[in-house]
A protein has these predicted regions:
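Phosphate/diphosphate ligand-binding glycine-rich loop within oxidoreductases
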Residues: 2-103, 196-198, 202-204, 208-220
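Glycine-rich adenosine-cofactor-binding loop
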Residues: 7, 90-93, 100, 109-130, ...
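Rossmann-like adenosine-cofactor binding region
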Residues: 146-212, 332-338
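Adenosine-phosphate binding glycine-rich loop
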Residues: 192-252, 394
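ATP-dependent small-molecule kinase phosphotransfer cores
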Residues: 284-340
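A glycine- and Lys/Arg-enriched "phosphate-lid" helix/loop adjacent to the NTP-binding pocket
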Residues: 344-383, 390
Length: 411
């Protein structure tokens, strides 16, 4: 192994893709149990490695030198082999500092809460101290060494909330370390989780009009800092933004909403082909799981039960996917929960096809006649507009709509 990352569980790491964009060097992912880590360090058969949870502290006794920032934090995420000497660094400090600045937060002279008490929490404490936070409090399920409980945290005032726990991380997408509504003084929220692209707590915070950000930019910046140690040469600062945008776009889903018969499935398949992405149709996933057509499910269960089924399928089968094109059912927009789930990794495009270009069909229970279609259009149109990231006029040909979505997504 020339360069790479070691950790216990790394099936969904973004690091290889990021390092491919940084430079022309091989970067390997190696999962291993704790007992295998010492042998890797003793053998020293690498030029440089990143170290991820839960080994950032475990590696430290095996290093010949640890830089001051890593020693202050108490953990190492980058190890470089310099002529047989292992030197440890913590580039998470660089990444988290950049992430806090990116969200627009200024912790100077203000109180902050850190949720979690692991290695990343120690990094957050060091970063917030360097940025001048007036009071830094750790929140833990098992409070000790000055940490407080989650119940006590809800009584504290804080301008910046930093989540360092794995709450909300794939595949546990519907979890959150805290409810931002319980922290009315919060000016910003930083969540170090990077998968999904928008965690539950970040979406909840943004819905309140408060700046919030997940950890992908931190991951990119710390990777660049690690690469500079690996290669002993600087990476131009502008590369961070370019790499961040490339990785985010490659992972982000294109989610299509709109009325029945507006062309979501047809456009979605053509778009997926054009972009070489997998395609998923929410209605097809429902039918596949249920073993019955949607019209039969409506007739047997009623609309309320069908909507429950639809949300369950979105949560279980679609929300965690990345780099896909997803066509939703016409009524998926009715539930805000569906939109939140789909936004975790997706950007939502409303295919706005004029009412006179829509066609009622018997296989669409809520739009089986011209009158029913008109009623649905009038009821749902405001929701389609409110619950999308971009409205795409869809009165033209499939090719024209595909081009419009593609251009909007890549802009």
């Amino acid at each position: 192994m020339e360069f790479g990352v070691i950790g216990e569980h790394l099936p969904h790491t973004f690091s290889p893709e990021i390092h491919r964009l940084i430079g022309d060097y091989a970067y390997t992912v190696r999962e291993m149990p704790p007992e295998a880590v010492p042998a890797v360090l003793k053998e020293r058969a690498f030029r440089g490695i990143n170290v991820t949870i839960p080994y950032k502290e475990l590696v430290m006794p095996y290093l010949d030198e640890i830089d001051d920032a890593a020693r202050a934090v108490g953990s190492v995420n980058t190890v470089v082999n310099r002529g047989g000497r292992l030197i440890g660094y913590n580039t998470d400090v660089d990444g988290l500092t950049a992430l806090i600045r990116r969200v627009g937060a200024d912790p100077a002279g203000k109180p902050a809460l850190i949720f979690g008490s692991g290695g990343t929490a120690h990094t957050a404490r060091a970063v917030l101290k360097a940025l001048g936070a007036s009071e830094i409090t750790t929140v833990s399920r098992h409070p000790q060494d000055g940490a407080i409980s989650y119940a006590e945290a809800r009584t504290r005032r804080a301008a910046l909330l930093v989540n360092t726990t794995p709450c909300g991380m794939f595949p546990h997408l519907d979890t959150a370390a805290f409810d931002p509504a319980e922290y009315p003084d919060a000016e910003a929220v930083v969540d170090v989780v990077y998968n999904p692209l928008r965690t539950k707590v970040v979406q909840q915070t943004q819905a309140r009009g408060i700046p919030a950000i997940t950890g992908l930019y931190m991951l990119v910046v710390q990777a660049i800092a690690a690469a500079e140690h690996f290669l002993r040469e600087p990476v131009p600062p502008a590369r961070a933004e370019a790499i961040f945008r490339r990785v985010r776009q490659s992972k982000e889903n294109i989610v299509l909403t709109g009325m029945p018969s507006c062309g979501k499935s047809t456009v979605g398949r053509a778009l997926a082909d054009a972009l070489s992405r997998p395609f998923f149709d929410a209605d097809e996933e429902i039918v596949r799981e249920a073993g019955e057509p949607i019209s039969a499910l409506f007739a047997k269960e009623g609309e309320a039960a069908f909507r429950e089924r639809e949300t369950a399928v979105i949560a279980r089968c679609l929300a965690g996917k990345t780099g896909c094109v997803i066509a939703t059912g016409g009524g998926a927009v009715l539930r805000e929960e569906n939109i939140r789930l789909l936004r975790q990794n997706g950007r939502i495009f409303f295919l706005d096809r004029p009412l006179d270009r829509l066609t009622p069909t018997g296989d669409r229970p809520t739009a089986s006649s011209a009158e029913a279609l008109r009623r649905r259009f009038e009821e749902r149109y405001p929701l389609y507009c409110a619950r999308c990231d971009r409205r795409i006029p869809a009165g033209g040909s499939v090719e024209e709509v595909v081009k419009a979505v593609k251009e909007a997504f890549e802009a």
